[in-house]
């Protein structure tokens, strides 16, 4: 299995700071904005960004939640083993709020479509934006585009982009891995 490093820990840190600054620029005090990390891997990115916004940029009172999309996906019955759902924790109303979905990799767009469907159970937001660390821009099945992009990556379908977070995987890095 061949792998190529796309982002080092240092590069990832620079990108996270840029994304945090873009969020501040567009949402200022976050009073009418909520941040929702998409389970499972978008949650780690969302937690990191919320912490950075609060501790390094002085944003206060950011409303943050997590959304599990397991049973909202259109491909959830295709696997051979039973699926295990993650936690959904949205302890606030999304009605008339600006929602920023956060996920690690945007590939086909199916996860985001599922997140939009799942979000309907929590109310009708004023606006929904999408922040992704990696945008695999030429692989979309659905017309979904991110509002905030850490890095755009051109990868063929037999390659996988994998994001590693030190909280879970011992280091912060992003690799392009050839599927076998």
Where are these regions (language model features)?
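Internal catalytic-core helix/loop-beta-alpha segment
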Residues: 90-120
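Active-site-facing substrate-recognition patch
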Residues: 1-32
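Cofactor-binding loop segments of dinucleotide-utilizing enzymes, especially the Rossmann-like FAD-
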Residues: 38, 69, 133-135
């Amino acid at each position: 299995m061949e792998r190529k490093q796309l982002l080092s820990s240092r590069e990832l840190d620079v990108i996270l700071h840029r994304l945090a600054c873009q969020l501040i620029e567009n949402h200022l005090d976050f009073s009418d904005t909520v941040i929702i990390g998409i389970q499972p891997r978008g949650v780690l990115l969302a937690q990191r960004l919320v912490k950075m916004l609060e501790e390094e940029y002085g944003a206060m009172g950011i409303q943050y939640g997590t959304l599990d999309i397991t049973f909202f996906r259109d491909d959830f019955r295709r696997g051979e083993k039973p699926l295990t759902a993650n936690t959904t924790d949205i302890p606030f109303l999304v009605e008339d709020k600006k929602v920023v979905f956060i996920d690690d990799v945007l590939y086909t767009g199916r996860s985001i479509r599922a997140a939009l469907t799942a979000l309907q159970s929590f109310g009708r937001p004023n606006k929904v934006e999408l922040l992704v660390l990696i945008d695999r821009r030429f692989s979309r099945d659905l017309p979904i585009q991110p509002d905030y992009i850490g890095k755009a990556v051109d990868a063929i379908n037999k390659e996988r982009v994998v994001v590693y977070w030190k909280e879970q995987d011992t280091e912060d890095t992003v690799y392009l891995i050839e599927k076998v």
